[in-house]
């Protein structure tokens, strides 16, 4: 029995000396493996008498249980030591302030577009949509823009393959909408019946070769169109003044219409506004182009300009957003600086 006690002690010492799981497995094999000390003792039982075999077998089993217990204890000690080391390496100071999870928000241009759509929606205007890569017909010809017009120059317009262009305004969406509207009511028109009015706005991205603090090669525009049988300049003024007051949430402003020229309207006017208070008080600010729809544009919609007339306007959404939020540099909207954009949540 004393020999087995020494064997158990040797095994326990070997396990304690092991510093890695691999070394511990080697020590285990030395005592419990196929060629280990205890396994060799078990094999020797076959040559012993029956009575002695029983007593010696009990001693070996007792020694084996003690060795296995020592092995289990060493494994647990090594696991505890490894866990303690990991905890020390990954320790956290729970007194430190937590990190706030960032939250997203609508871009200020998106906010402005949604506001514009809501205001005109309350006036009965539909919202049109259309492609940003346009044909020459819808972008220029249908809008009475002649082939020699400066707007067709490569200095002002982005051309793509196939003679198409990145739309320079959102008016093409109005023409597409009007053509679909007229086709849908062609039977009534042919019968001499009045057609339901075309009342639509077209917000979206547009592209021109321009870039500075107040201009971008990509910018957002909203254009409005109202075509019917008795639409006048008075209606244009009423609608736009109502819109601008609702957009800026104030009646403390003035609006003026200045004579101008656009190939798709006749007569045409620039629309300026002036705040009655605030940092921009007393300054006339250009916010839109407008006018009565040119008769040729009415024809291109499929309507008789002798019976139908309308007005149109086009405003820069980025410009309106700059004025609403007090932003002096247009490029701030598109730099992706979260310090700037987070102000609009």
Curated annotation (Swiss-Prot):
Enzyme class, spelled out: ligase
Does the record carry Magnesium as a key word? Answer: yes
Question: What does the similarity note say?
Answer: Belongs to the class-II aminoacyl-tRNA synthetase family. Phe-tRNA synthetase alpha subunit type 1 subfamily.
Which CDD domains does this chain map to? PheRS_alpha_core
List residues binding Mg(2+).
Answer: 266
What the entry lists under HAMAP family is as follows:
Phe_tRNA_synth_alpha1
Name of the featured protein: Phenylalanine--tRNA ligase alpha subunit
Can you supply one Gene Ontology CC term for this chain's record?
cytoplasm
What PROSITE patterns does the database record attribute to this sequence?
AA_TRNA_LIGASE_II (PS50862)
Species whose genome carries this gene:
Methylibium petroleiphilum (strain ATCC BAA-1232 / LMG 22953 / PM1)
One Pfam family for this entry, by name? Phe_tRNA-synt_N
Localisation per UniProt entry: Cytoplasm
Which GO BP terms apply?
Answer: phenylalanyl-tRNA aminoacylation
Molecular functions per Gene Ontology: ATP binding; magnesium ion binding; phenylalanine-tRNA ligase activity; tRNA binding
- SUPFAM superfamilies (alphabetical): Class II aaRS and biotin synthetases, tRNA-binding arm
Q: How is the cofactor bound?
A: Binds 2 magnesium ions per tetramer.
Q: Which cofactor does it need?
A: Mg(2+)
Q: Which InterPro entries match?
A: aa-tRNA-synth_II, aa-tRNA-synth_II/BPL/LPL, Phe-tRNA-synth_IIc_asu, Phe-tRNA_ligase_II_N, Phe_tRNA_ligase_alpha1_bac, Phenylalanyl-tRNA_Synthase, tRNA-bd_arm
Which transformation does this protein catalyse, written as a reaction? tRNA(Phe) + L-phenylalanine + ATP = L-phenylalanyl-tRNA(Phe) + AMP + diphosphate + H(+)
Query: Span of the secretion signal?
Result: none
Keywords from the UniProt entry: Aminoacyl-tRNA synthetase, ATP-binding, Cytoplasm, Ligase, Magnesium, Metal-binding, Nucleotide-binding, Protein biosynthesis
**Annotated EC:** 6.1.1.20
Asked if the record carries the keyword ATP-binding, the reply is: yes
Source lineage: Bacteria, Pseudomonadati, Pseudomonadota, Betaproteobacteria, Burkholderiales
Instruction: State whether it acts alone or in a complex, and with which partners, per the record.
Output: Tetramer of two alpha and two beta subunits.
